[in-house]
């Protein structure tokens, strides 16, 4: 994939980052080809999450265009539109008005094409790797849980600030992978280091665009805790299989209900 135009648009050295991204993609393919990852997962959840994010953003562009905002919606949608599409503001929207669904909908709402593009690039790169490692039910649970831990830290850090984006969950995936693969010792060292490089890349990008560091930290801590607690042994994974199927169904249902509830507010 040609990453150069994307990084050039951010004022970064596109040629250098193109080389880095190509090298990381090659390393990831080598890791999976050499059998470091177990087989057996269909990887469906990652791409479903990607599709939901893209569809939700497309709906926002259409709604913003219909409201007369034009192309500004594509690159920098205004705050009211972000709130209409589930942006999170703890005070007053959640704590006073009880709009609890925003604790999940914010993670599917993005403040422009660059914001969406970055989060989807990272999800596309690391999501299939983690889903293949731990299975779809655990992956869905992890993704949803870290969206919640990301926004919960924001409650204490900046309760009155509008927050949007999947980066809390993305950092959650990275935090999980670093902790989980670190527990594997030398067998997981290459994958742990791969994820650490992604963490550095994500942090630098977030610093450049002034992203929500509280959400990043909350997601990463939630993911790391998940990675430290999740059983590594086959026996432990089998013992918890039913639990995570139930949790995944609950997570998916909560996400669908939250997005549906947000859509319902458009007609009130």
Region spans (language model):
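A detector for small-residue-rich transmembrane helices and their helix-helix packing motifs
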Residues: 2-268
